[in-house]
């Protein structure tokens, strides 16, 4: 985040400025801006205003961090019995193996806090705040490869196409800000990693929800979102005029086909203009 510089800060500052005062816009533009304001709030009172969700793709196994499995060490080296495997198919990396030995963690675990949560010695600082954390260990998937497992974790299904958790948060919480996306995605590859984890846009996709809830990826540098700046030689007023004409064409299409996604696209274009 520290490398994002003025980019995100500039967008945040812009959200505090009256959008109608930023350059010359036509009457149609004003109407569209008022139409495509913040996302409507839900019909119930949300218990949270915002969600920061961190997903460490390719991070250490939970079996080495906080999911203590003493029997894995007790039976270390023993071939995995069929009663456990139950015909589970093999991965490409293990299909050539003759045996499938049980492997325990190489790290020591201790219990911490009043909750007596198990944490390994890999996380000495996290162990100091375990009573402020909730460990969910009941999730289960039959996926045996990273890609379908990660897709399941983000969308609740191994098959691509369903809304991501961030899109559901956007849908459930709404938005009080009409100048920034309600769902923002930041990617970080860390240091010293020659090949980052393959992360696909479907992991923050909106699925069958409106594209208003699609995650918007912010990049580092002066242009956190691509194509927001006016092209060279094109003024803000000229861009406003082009957007107005484009909106007229899209509105005609919406009247013909009745596809609500067309209105969502108009709203997204207007947000990009305000950003």
Enumerate the predicted regions with their spans.
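Ligand-binding pockets and gating/stacking loops
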Residues: 1-275
């Amino acid at each position: 985040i520290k490398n994002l510089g003025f980019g995100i800060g500039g967008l945040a500052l812009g959200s505090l400025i009256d959008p109608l005062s930023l350059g010359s816009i036509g009457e149609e533009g004003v109407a569209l801006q008022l139409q495509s304001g913040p996302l409507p709030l839900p019909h119930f009172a949300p218990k949270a205003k915002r969600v920061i969700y961190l997903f460490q793709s390719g991070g250490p196994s939970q079996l080495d961090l906080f999911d203590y499995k003493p029997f894995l060490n007790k039976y270390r080296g023993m071939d995995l019995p069929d009663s456990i495997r139950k015909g589970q198919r093999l991965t490409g990396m293990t299909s050539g193996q003759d045996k499938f030995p049980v492997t325990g963690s190489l790290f020591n675990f201790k219990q911490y806090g009043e909750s007596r949560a198990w944490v390994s010695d890999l996380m000495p600082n996290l162990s100091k705040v375990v009573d402020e954390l909730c460990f969910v260990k009941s999730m289960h998937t039959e996926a045996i490869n990273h890609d379908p497992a990660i897709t399941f974790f983000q969308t609740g299904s191994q098959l691509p196409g369903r809304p991501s958790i961030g899109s559901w948060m956007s849908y459930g919480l709404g938005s009080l800000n009409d100048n920034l996306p309600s769902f923002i995605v930041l990617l970080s590859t860390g240091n010293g990693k020659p090949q980052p984890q393959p992360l696909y846009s479907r992991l923050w996709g909106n699925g069958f929800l409106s594209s208003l809830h699609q995650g918007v990826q912010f990049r580092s540098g002066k242009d956190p979102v691509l194509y927001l700046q006016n092209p060279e030689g094109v003024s803000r007023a000229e861009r406003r005029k082009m957007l107005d004409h484009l909106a007229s064409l899209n509105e005609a299409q919406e009247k013909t086909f009745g596809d609500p996604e067309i209105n969502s696209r108009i709203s997204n274009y207007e947000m990009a203009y305000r950003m």
